[in-house]
C-alpha cells in the first residue's frame, strides 16, 4: 500500500477536519482520481508517434491508455472526426496513490528550472491541473529510447468544494507550490 495513502488516512484526515471544522470525516476532501492526457497532434502524419506516446504513458502510469479521437472535423488543423489525436489514462485507487507519490517525490523535482508549481491552476472546485513539458522527468522513461520529447497534462480531481480546500489538501502532502 502506498505510504501517502496511509499518511492521508492516519494524519491528513484529522488535520483537515479540525482546520475546516467538519462534523464528519466524510466531509474531508480526498483525491478522487488523477488523469494523465497526452495530445499528439503530429499523429496525423506519422502513426508511429501515437504508438510511442501510448508506450510512454503506459510506462508512466502502469496502465494501458485510452486513445482519444477527434470529436469533430477542423479544416484548419487538417483533422477529421474520429481521427486518433492523443491518449489518456485515468488512475484511481492504489495506482493513483503510487503515481501521486512518484509525482511529488521524484518527477516534479526533476523539472528543469523548477521554482514551484502555480497555486492559480485550480479550477474553482478544488481540482488542480498542471502541464509537464517533457515526459523524461519520470524515471520510468528511458532517455535513450525517447523518439521525441512530448509533454502531458496532469489533472488531480478532488472532492473539495473550493480551491482553498483543494490547496490545503495538496499542501499537507508537501505539494511544491510557488511561494
Curated annotation (Swiss-Prot):
Pfam families: Ribosomal_L5, Ribosomal_L5_C. GO terms for biological process: translation. It comes from the Bacteria. One of its GO terms (molecular function) is rRNA binding. GO terms for cellular component: ribonucleoprotein complex; ribosome. Coiled coil: none annotated. Transmembrane segments: none annotated. Keywords: Ribonucleoprotein, Ribosomal protein, RNA-binding, rRNA-binding, tRNA-binding. Belongs to the universal ribosomal protein uL5 family. PANTHER family: 60S RIBOSOMAL PROTEIN L11-RELATED. This is one of the proteins that bind and probably mediate the attachment of the 5S RNA into the large ribosomal subunit, where it forms part of the central protuberance. In the 70S ribosome it contacts protein S13 of the 30S subunit (bridge B1b), connecting the 2 subunits; this bridge is implicated in subunit movement. Contacts the P site tRNA; the 5S rRNA and some of its associated proteins might help stabilize positioning of ribosome-bound tRNAs. This is Large ribosomal subunit protein uL5.
Amino acid at each position: 500500500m502506498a505510504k501517502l495513502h496511509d499518511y492521508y488516512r492516519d494524519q491528513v484526515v484529522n488535520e483537515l477536519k479540525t482546520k475546516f471544522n467538519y462534523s464528519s470525516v466524510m466531509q474531508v476532501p480526498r483525491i478522487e482520481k488523477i488523469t494523465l492526457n497526452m495530445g499528439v497532434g503530429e499523429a496525423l502524419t506519422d502513426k508511429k508517434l501515437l504508438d510511442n506516446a501510448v508506450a510512454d504513458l503506459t510506462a508512466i502510469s502502469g496502465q494501458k491508455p485510452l486513445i482519444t479521437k477527434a470529436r469533430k472535423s477542423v479544416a484548419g488543423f487538417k483533422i477529421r472526426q474520429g481521427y486518433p489525436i492523443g491518449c489518456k489514462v485515468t488512475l484511481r485507487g492504489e495506482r493513483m496513490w503510487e503515481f501521486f507519490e512518484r509525482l511529488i517525490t521524484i518527477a516534479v523535482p526533476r523539472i528543469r528550472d523548477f521554482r514551484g508549481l502555480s497555486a492559480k491552476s485550480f479550477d474553482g472546485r478544488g481540482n488542480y491541473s498542471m502541464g509537464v513539458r517533457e515526459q523524461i522527468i519520470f524515471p520510468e522513461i528511458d532517455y535513450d529510447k525517447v523518439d521525441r520529447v512530448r509533454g502531458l497534462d496532469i489533472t488531480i480531481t478532488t472532492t473539495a468544494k473550493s480551491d482553498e480546500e483543494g490547496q490545503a489538501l495538496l499542501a499537507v502532502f508537501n505539494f511544491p507550490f510557488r511561494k
